[in-house]
């Protein structure tokens, strides 16, 4: 009996030790890559948060990208207010939460930036703001960005990351497709350069409007780029589609983008393109 009690006590002590050790291990040390499914130690993602196995770029906040890409940045005033025209339930609360998470008023950060003294208008979408969806305020900020660039004679660089039009605003969000496209057209008519960089994900109404209307379209490795999502396509076609159909590499092969650029090279490539087209988009 004493031997049994001793063994039981040892077992309890071992269980308690394991529970305490488990509690001391912080969350988030290991992350699963959404593309290759490999488990990665978080420090191995590095400064640019890139999978060391497949080079997939993890979704990143707009203000973090800003540090990667530019030497200076002057933000545009956040004058565009996000409406709730359909009185969608809990939409204001969802907006406030997204604003707290990202530090942005809406899903895009806009302003005027420089890379090695090359000045340009910059917009960076944030996938952590309601999946980077495009609402009325987003469309207004993008439109104002292009109008400013047209007025000042500046090129535009826009980093797209969006699930598409924001469902909480219904037809008002879809109207932003035409609105932003008109602003892009006016900018192009002045012979000014527009570069877009498509990141994961770039889908829906954003893909069908300003994101793919650029003079030069770049993308990140393994980024999902398309209009409808995989599930919608498969339900419509009643068949499975290739796993890589909407990957940037397939989109490049099919001629819809111009180049895939890794995160560590983006600042250099963008500077080279700005320098090359100092006289305008057609030089």
UniProtKB/Swiss-Prot annotation:
Please give the chief subcellular localization of this protein.
cytoplasm
**Bound how, and how many: what does the cofactor note say?**
Binds 1 zinc ion per subunit.
Question: Where does it reside?
Answer: Cytoplasm
Zinc finger motifs (C4-type), residue ranges: 33-54
Q: Specify which residues bind Zn(2+) according to the UniProt entry for this protein.
A: 33, 36, 51, 54
In terms of SUPFAM superfamilies, this protein maps to: ClpP/crotonase
- Record-linked PANTHER family: ACETYL-COENZYME A CARBOXYLASE CARBOXYL TRANSFERASE SUBUNIT BETA, CHLOROPLASTIC
State the similarity comment.
Belongs to the AccD/PCCB family.
Record-given protein name: Acetyl-coenzyme A carboxylase carboxyl transferase subunit beta
Q: Which organism is it from?
A: Latilactobacillus sakei subsp. sakei (strain 23K) (Lactobacillus sakei subsp. sakei)
Organism ancestry = Bacteria, Bacillati, Bacillota, Bacilli, Lactobacillales
């Amino acid at each position: 009996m004493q031997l049994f009690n001793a063994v039981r006590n040892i077992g309890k002590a071992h269980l308690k030790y394991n529970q305490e050790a488990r509690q001391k291990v912080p969350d988030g040390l290991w992350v699963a890559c959404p593309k290759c499914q490999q488990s990665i130690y978080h420090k191995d993602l590095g400064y640019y948060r890139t999978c060391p196995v497949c080079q997939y770029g993890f979704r990143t906040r707009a203000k973090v990208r800003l540090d990667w890409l530019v030497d200076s940045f002057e933000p545009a005033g956040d004058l565009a207010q996000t409406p709730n025209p359909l009185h969608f339930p809990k939409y204001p609360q969802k907006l406030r939460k997204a604003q707290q998470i990202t530090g942005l008023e809406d899903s895009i950060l806009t302003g005027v930036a420089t890379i090695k003294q090359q000045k340009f208008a910059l917009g960076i979408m944030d996938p952590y703001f309601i999946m980077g969806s495009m609402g009325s305020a987003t469309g207004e900020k993008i439109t104002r960005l292009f109008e400013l660039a047209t007025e000042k004679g500046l090129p535009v660089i826009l980093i797209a990351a969006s699930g598409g039009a924001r469902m909480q605003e219904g037809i008002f969000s879809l109207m932003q497709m035409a609105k932003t496209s008109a602003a892009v057209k006016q900018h192009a008519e002045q012979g000014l350069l527009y570069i877009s960089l498509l990141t994961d994900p770039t889908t829906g109404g954003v893909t069908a409007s300003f994101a793919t209307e650029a003079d030069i379209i770049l993308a990140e490795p393994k980024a999902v780029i398309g209009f409808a999502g995989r599930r919608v396509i498969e339900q419509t076609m009643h068949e499975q589609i290739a796993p890589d159909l909407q990957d940037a590499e397939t989109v490049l092969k099919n001629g819809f983008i111009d180049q895939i650029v890794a995160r560590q090279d983006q600042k250099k490539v963008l500077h080279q393109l700005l320098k090359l087209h100092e006289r305008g988009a057609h030089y």
